[in-house]
């Protein structure tokens, strides 16, 4: 009996252990499975429906984003087409002289004629001002546009983008002239407070006069090199234009550009081309030259003496200039350039021969003590010609014979030009 009882107890324990093991395995499998969502089919259908709806919405968004630029471009293109029709083509260019009211003005064309015209409503009124360049309809000359930031092409050419390479060291002698132009042009631009403390006004401009080849243009180039100011160079003949009113307009444009790029220096070479003495004449061309000079006088009187604009003029014939042009208040300082003396000639020869290989036979003193009058340009021409003679004979050194031959050739050409001028 006892044996049967022990066997039953062992069987019950084994059964209990097996049940526990099965329960543990079943619980482990249930924990590893994902939770089930009921009803499963309904949730899947809803998920697919929402996914399809999101795809359709993104597709619609892409289509709308592609259509909006087309609509805006179509609208802008149609507006541009209407504006172009109103403007007309091709467009002419004129100058706005004055306003009559908000919708009308007076303009001048390239031939000098004045017109009372309409100003279109689509033109930017903030850009319109007397003297600006405007676009005109080719049929009725109405103002249809404004050229912004324009600069006359001729004035743009006059403006030197790169400073000249000449310096004061390249000028032989002329110490007095250099000092005067420094006091008149360079010092007022670099140290204007000195004149204010002294209680005086600096000169508006200077005029350089003297014989040809004495260094007037060279000194002006040296001033442009020494200062960081904008340098505008113009020859007097460039201010003489074919059509009526173009010369004075070019003078106004020249001073306007100088004011825009201040501090600036205006160098007018050969001023006698437009600054000659006035007299009664029936010639239309001569009257136009006189009008150009009157505009130059007006500009010299107009700008303030303490602003950053200086004027340098140069001429060979100061006696031919109109007294109103060179009177004090307009051109306050007159600097004369004479023929160089022996010491100055020696300095000029040393400057031009400093980079040349000279033979031992070269004696500059013999060239200086000659009876002929030598200007700075003549000395430079002699040195250049002597170097070319040496090159012609395949030599690297320049001899005294080369200088003598060069001097004879230069003076022969000079005398020939003088003789031709007497009988022309």
From Swiss-Prot:
Residues 1-11 have a biased composition (Basic and acidic residues). This is 26S proteasome regulatory subunit 4 homolog. Acts as a regulatory subunit of the 26S proteasome which degrades poly-ubiquitinated proteins in the cytoplasm and in the nucleus. It is essential for the regulated turnover of proteins and for the removal of misfolded proteins. The proteasome is a multicatalytic proteinase complex that is characterized by its ability to cleave peptides with Arg, Phe, Tyr, Leu, and Glu adjacent to the leaving group at neutral or slightly basic pH. It comes from Encephalitozoon cuniculi (strain GB-M1) (Microsporidian parasite). SMART domains: AAA. Pfam families: AAA, AAA_lid_3, Prot_ATP_ID_OB_C. The gene is RPT2. Belongs to the AAA ATPase family. Signal peptide: none annotated. Keywords: ATP-binding, Cytoplasm, Nucleotide-binding, Nucleus, Proteasome. CDD domains: RecA-like_PAN_like (cd19502). The 26S proteasome consists of a 20S proteasome core and two 19S regulatory subunits. The 20S proteasome core is composed of 28 subunits that are arranged in four stacked rings, resulting in a barrel-shaped structure. The two end rings are each formed by seven alpha subunits, and the two central rings are each formed by seven beta subunits. The catalytic chamber with the active sites is on the inside of the barrel. It is found in: Cytoplasm; Nucleus. Residues 1-33 are annotated as: Disordered. ATP binds at residues 210-217. GO terms for cellular component: cytoplasm; nucleus; proteasome regulatory particle, base subcomplex. GO terms for molecular function: ATP binding; ATP hydrolysis activity. It comes from the Eukaryota.
